[in-house]
């Protein structure tokens, strides 16, 4: 298992960071957040122009034919800049799943528009009162050459701006994954307020009709398990960027801020907190990259994904709390950039199961 990045992978991360730091400045984020939806369509188009939207997609749909590791690098950069773009929803939950499990017709219908930035995707994994996303309560019943989908999905990322949602549902053969037009009859979106301000909605499906050609073929249970594992690792990649940047901001502040005639970073109590936070960032980093490496090499990694998500949640909360506390009062000032990182870390901690939920799931597997 080699975690050394290639020159091409480092270039992808560098291009993404430069683009996000140029466009997603604190001042610009404040402007975006004052609007109806925290989504920057112009930045999304710039990602398309930079060939970043197709990094993990096949060449025959306009992609760069890279893989999951490159996608994780891009997600980490989203977290570093808390960028207002649906990379996680569109590229990981949606496009990556269609690229791996869709037939050629499905890939050609959906993925070229993703690469150009004109189609946004998402997937609904979480359901009300259900703790295991791999066992959906949503149902799909056959209606001649189509399917009718009934059920609900909660906290669907980017649902307000997405065109299509992937829906795991129980069907005649067990479980399947269906591509649902979010503007179709029988689909109702109810936007929800989130901790980090990112667009999410509860989606209600009341007999929503899906064409037979919009069901992904293959073993549905394996598809959903794989999607869930990749979704967890994607969140961990974002969390790595979030916590690494929060620690960097805190390190700079403790170097510059003086008290009693010297930088507060010279005090032992502050040094200990910062050292513990550094160790926590490294725990998130290496558990995430272990799981991402396995997934990127076509291996199952549900256990490793759960371990990584545990660390992303547990350690992420400690890191951002430390970053705020060494700042004092300015750490929670909404005109200072750190507050966004605390909110993003909390959102990532709880999405698709907290640290305790990951431990419970890991324990139940033995």
Annotated model-derived regions:
Residues 65-74, 132-136, 180, 209-210, ...:
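Structural signature of FAD isoalloxazine-binding scaffolds in flavoprotein oxidoreductases
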Residues 117-128:
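A short, Trp-centered hydrophobic/proline-enriched beta-strand micro-motif
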Residues 27-35, 251, 255-262, 278-311, ...:
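C-terminal helix-coil-helix/basic helical segment that borders enzyme active sites and/or dimer interfaces
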Residues 124, 150-187:
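A short core secondary-structure module
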């Amino acid at each position: 298992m080699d975690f050394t990045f290639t020159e091409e992978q480092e270039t992808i991360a560098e291009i993404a960071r430069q683009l996000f730091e140029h466009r997603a400045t604190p001042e610009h984020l404040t402007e975006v957040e004052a609007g109806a939806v925290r989504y920057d369509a112009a930045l999304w188009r710039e990602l398309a122009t930079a060939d970043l939207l197709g990094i993990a997609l096949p060449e025959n749909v306009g992609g760069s034919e890279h893989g999951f590791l490159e996608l994780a690098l891009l997600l980490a950069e989203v977290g570093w800049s808390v960028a207002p773009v649906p990379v996680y929803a569109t590229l990981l939950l949606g496009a990556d799943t269609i690229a791996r499990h869709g037939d050629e017709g499905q890939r050609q219908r959906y993925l070229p528009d993703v690469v150009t930035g004109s189609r946004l995707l998402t997937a609904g994994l979480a359901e009300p009162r259900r703790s295991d996303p791999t066992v959906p309560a949503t149902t799909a019943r056959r209606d001649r050459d189509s399917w009718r989908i009934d059920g609900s999905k909660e906290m669907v990322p980017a649902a307000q701006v997405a065109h299509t949602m992937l829906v795991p549902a129980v069907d005649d053969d067990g479980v399947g994954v269906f591509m649902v037009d979010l503007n179709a009859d029988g689909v109702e979106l109810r936007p929800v307020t989130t901790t980090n301000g990112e667009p999410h909605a509860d989606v209600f499906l009341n007999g929503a009709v899906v064409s037979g050609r919009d069901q992904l073929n293959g073993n549905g249970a394996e598809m959903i398990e794989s999607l869930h594992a990749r979704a967890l690792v994607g969140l961990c990649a974002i969390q790595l960027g979030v916590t690494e940047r929060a620690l960097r901001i805190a390190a700079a502040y403790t170097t510059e801020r003086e008290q009693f005639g010297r930088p507060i970073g010279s005090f032992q109590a502050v040094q200990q907190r910062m050292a513990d936070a550094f160790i926590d960032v490294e725990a998130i980093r290496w558990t995430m990259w272990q799981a991402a490496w396995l997934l990127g090499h076509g291996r199952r990694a549900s256990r490793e994904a759960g371990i990584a998500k545990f660390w992303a949640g547990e350690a992420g909360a400690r890191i951002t709390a430390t970053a705020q506390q060494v700042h004092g009062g300015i750490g929670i000032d909404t005109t200072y950039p750190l507050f966004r990182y605390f909110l993003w870390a909390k959102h990532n901690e709880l999405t698709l199961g907290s640290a305790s939920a990951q431990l419970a799931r890991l324990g139940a597997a033995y």
